A protein has these predicted regions:
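Surface-exposed loop/turn elements that mediate protein-protein interactions on large endomembrane-trafficking
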Residues: 11, 16-19, 72-77, 121-133, ...
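Beta-strand C-termini and the immediately following turn/loop, strongest in propeller blades
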Residues: 1-4, 12, 47-48, 54-62, ...
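Beta-rich catalytic cores
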Residues: 42-44, 117, 138-141, 161
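Surface-exposed loop and turn segments in beta-propeller and other repeat-based domains
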Residues: 16-41, 77-99, 180-194
Length: 325
């Protein structure tokens, strides 16, 4: 991968010739949302065919089969399904995942919805056919398949469900929960989370996570904590075990103690990170005020390290926050 030209190349060791193999795809092969002052990295390689004549490359959504002999044009193995449905299709990690695929290979892949943040576990064959195995408002992790490939141990999580282990057949049918590692959660008030969207001061859609107390009453006023570090919306279905921290505060700890926690995504324009932060964080906070969720005089701001700099910037530009850390 050439990060400056943002293309994939093949190199012929016999002739020393370098040939661009990704321009013909027609979609960017680099991370388009990359907002750091450095060349954007590639989405990556999924694997190779067993004969070594083809490589599978990722774009933002799909798999592309590239013929390294140059005889055939790039082919979208997943037939554009990911882009059409807004889902990123990626190989899942396990003890049996491979980088080299036989013609009859069936690969376990994740389909992650970039809008809802839900995830599905699918089977992808080398003809591009997808078969759904399980799906939901979870993040799934595969731990291990049995040596005979008949059974599997895996887990799932979301904001209220701990990462307990599950056992099932290798196609994830007949699942059985085999651990209950966090029973003490039932003894505490917990919380909920939802993905919210608003228009920021750059006139772009902005996303963020809003954590609410378990017994949230929209008729009452709650103290609100606004905290951020780059992006958070992709963490919608991540379980947070309450803990103390010297960096960002744990959202479920605060929600359990009667706080609203707002974690907006911040996307940066290179060279003006402070203003980018202002456009996202302040617009999102004012959106919550307009919706009657947050209330002036009861809004705190929290940032750490890189977002600590941005917090220092924000308090020189607005008085919307009662206190800042």
């Amino acid at each position: 991968y050439d990060p400056i030209a943002q293309v994939w190349n093949k190199f012929d060791g016999a002739t020393g010739k370098v040939v661009n193999i990704s321009d013909a795809i027609g979609y960017p092969m680099f991370m388009e949302s990359y907002d750091k002052p450095a060349p954007a990295p590639a989405y990556g390689i999924a694997g190779w065919t067993a004969d070594g004549n083809n490589v599978f490359l990722y774009d933002a959504y799909d798999w592309w089969k590239i013929d390294l002999t140059g005889e055939r044009q790039p082919e979208c193995l997943t037939k554009g399904y990911g882009r059409k449905h807004g889902k990123s299709i990626r190989k899942m990690t396990s003890n049996i995942d491979k980088d080299v695929f036989q013609k009859d290979e069936k690969v376990i892949v994740s389909l992650w919805d970039k809008d809802t943040m839900d995830e599905g576990v699918y089977q992808l064959d080398m003809k591009g056919r997808l078969r759904k195995l399980m799906e939901g408002n979870y993040v799934y992790t595969i731990h291990r398949f049995s040596d005979n490939h008949e059974y599997c141990v895996w887990n799932r999580q979301n904001v209220s469900e701990f990462r307990d282990l599950w056992w099932s057949k290798s196609d994830f049918s007949n699942p059985v929960k085999v651990t209950n590692a966090n029973p003490q959660q039932a003894d505490y008030k917990w919380g909920t989370v939802k993905l919210i969207k608003w228009t920021n001061y750059e006139n772009k859609e902005n996303k963020g996570l809003l954590y609410l107390p378990e017994d949230y009453d929209p008729q009452k006023e709650y103290p609100a904590l606004v905290q951020f570090y780059e992006t958070h919306s992709g963490e919608l279905n991540i379980y947070h075990a309450p803990l103390l921290s010297s960096a960002l505060g744990d959202p479920m700890y605060f929600a359990s103690n009667g706080y609203i926690v707002f974690m907006p995504d911040v996307h940066f324009t290179v060279g003006t990170p402070g203003q980018s932060c202002y456009d996202a964080v302040v617009s999102g906070t004012k959106y919550l005020i307009e919706q009657g969720i947050a209330h002036p005089g009861k809004i705190g701001l929290q940032g750490h390290s890189w977002s600590g700099y941005q917090t220092s910037y924000l308090v020189t530009k607005t008085d919307i926050f009662t206190c800042a850390n």
